[in-house]
Amino acid sequence: MKPDESPQYWDSISRTFTKDAHHSLWRSHSDQINMSLLEDWLGSRQVTNLLKTDLFDEAVSLGLYPLLSEHAGGVYGIDLAAESADEAKKQFPELEAVCADVRKLPFSDNQFDLIVSNSTLDHFQSKKEIDVGFQELFRVLGEGGELLISLDNLQNPIVGLRNLLPYRLLNRLKLVPYFVGKTFGRRGFAAALEKAGFEVLETKAIMHCPRVFAVAVSGILQRRASEKSQRRFLAFLQQFEFFGRLPTRFFTGYFVAIRARKPADPQSKKP
């Protein structure tokens, strides 16, 4: 395990974001983007057991737990960082928070009816590790269950350029706050899920605002602007999601989101 993938590293990132309130306005926008997607895909669905594959959102902001808990009898969450799992549990006592690696899940086969994974598996050094994560998600998801998953979008030119440059340089220039790893474009993402046995049902591109600009302005407004001005800025950022309806959406979106299903007869989908 590389230093940037270690639990200790992600513990330090969790501590930084938990203590730094300057990130909260941007985190609110990020949460809203993810909640809008999930509201669309979940509808009125109710499940027994739901798994969320990291707890960073719930450790540093409200995250997705309030929405997910409306749709599931039990919500489980994992995180490689014990600090994130602990902070999320403090905020949401009914959450079943577990310190674990998505590549080696401590759960039984077919345990979950639904899995939500927002930008968890795009922090690894290799695509092979992402494939291992997909295989584990397939294992613990019940037959007919759905996986709602997003990754950094390699088709976005900014993301593509970022992934060509050394992480140490980007971090030193404060362009990325934590390690970002390998990822896919839309077609490669879908192909990798299908290789793991999933049936891809729907693909979307999300988060279309100019991210570097938006993060920088969010930090300034968080420190200096009134709550009313901050709300207006969040509404302004939300307008960029219009680009998700255009043919160019997979070039402007920073994330690719896929709704996939584990077939009732999963062996029929395995290569």
Which stretches of residues belong to each language-model region?
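A short glycine-rich, Lys/Arg-flanked "PGG" loop and its adjoining helix->strand segment in the class I
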Residues: 131-146
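Class I SAM-dependent methyltransferase SAM/SAH-binding core
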Residues: 51-104
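Short alpha-helix
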Residues: 180-197, 203
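Acceptor-substrate binding/catalytic loop of class I
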Residues: 29, 171-188
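A conserved beta-strand element that flanks and buttresses the S-adenosyl-L-methionine
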Residues: 116
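Conserved class I S-adenosyl-L-methionine
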Residues: 1-46, 148-170
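A C-terminal cap/extension of S-adenosyl-L-methionine-dependent methyltransferases
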Residues: 202-271
